[in-house]
UniProtKB/Swiss-Prot annotation:
Descriptive protein name: Pole-localizer protein TmaR
Name of the gene this protein is made from: tmaR
Originating organism: Salmonella arizonae (strain ATCC BAA-731 / CDC346-86 / RSK2980)
Localization (cell): Cytoplasm
Alphabetized InterPro entries for the sequence: DUF496, UPF0265
HAMAP family: Pole_loc_TmaR (MF_00683)
Annotated TM spans: none
One GO cellular component, as annotated: cytosol
Family: Belongs to the pole-localizer TmaR family.
């Protein structure tokens, strides 16, 4: 009975994909943290604008706050999009890894 060993290139590809999958998972967690942080900043700026009094050069302060809030909201949106893209790539890699494992398992059973 002959056993088919995966080629060296197959093993390297499997390791490369597995490492990429793990790296993507870490990036997802990092981005989720950034999303939370920026959402907190948006809330902070909302609350801050409630405390600004008319005697404090309201137009200038409110303009700055609106600009900062917009920047943070844009960052949150960018992180959400990036997270979705990374999640999709991670799912694709998981499918490839699973298929590679199933092919190896099928090759072993065929013998």
């Amino acid at each position: 009975m002959e056993t088919t060993k995966p080629s060296f290139q197959d093993v390297l590809e499997f390791v490369r994909l597995f490492r990429r999958k793990n790296k993507l998972q870490r990036e997802i967690q990092d981005i989720e943290k950034k999303i939370r942080d920026n959402q907190k900043r948006v809330l902070l700026l909302d609350n801050l604008s409630d405390y600004i009094k008319p005697g404090m050069s309201v137009e200038a302060i409110q303009g700055i706050i609106a600009s900062m809030k917009s920047d943070y909201e844009d960052r949150v949106d960018d992180y959400i999009i990036k997270n979705a893209e990374i999640s999709k790539e991670r799912r694709d890699i998981s499918k490839k890894l699973k298929a590679m494992g199933e092919m190896k398992h099928a090759d072993v059973k065929a013998e």
